[in-house]
């Protein structure tokens, strides 16, 4: 489950899976009834695609040395901005520390696994 920047407000259910040795993440369900239904602000092939099914994590590769997933990209569908990405699994994969970088700036979100 992804959360807003306040870390308390759930925004979406995101399914994260391996595909061809990389992690991808797709929105499975939007939890905010006020949010847009399509990614109108996206600038690439995701422009105007439905939020449900939208691939927001692309290309993260496993770094066995430190256990992180690196060199990926994460999309903020609210404003269409794409960030460099590092994912650090914690608590046996039940928690993901998601860090997006834009230049020298970054922000971190904590995502929690839902269901089986």
What are these regions (language model features)?
Residues 73-74, 86:
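Functional cores of ribonucleases/endoribonucleases
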Residues 93, 101-116:
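Edge beta-strand at a domain terminus
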């Amino acid at each position: 489950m992804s959360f807003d920047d306040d870390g308390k407000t759930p925004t979406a259910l995101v399914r994260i899976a391996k595909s061809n040795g990389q992690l991808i993440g797709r929105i499975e369900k939007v939890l905010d009834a006020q949010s847009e239904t399509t990614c109108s602000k996206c600038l690439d092939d995701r422009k105007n695609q439905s939020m449900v099914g939208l691939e927001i994590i692309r290309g993260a590769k496993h770094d066995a040395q430190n256990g992180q997933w690196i060199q990926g990209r994460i999309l903020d569908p609210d404003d269409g901005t794409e960030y460099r990405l590092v994912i650090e699994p914690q608590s046996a994969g039940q928690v993901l520390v998601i860090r997006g970088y834009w230049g020298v700036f970054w922000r971190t979100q904590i995502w929690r696994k839902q269901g089986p």
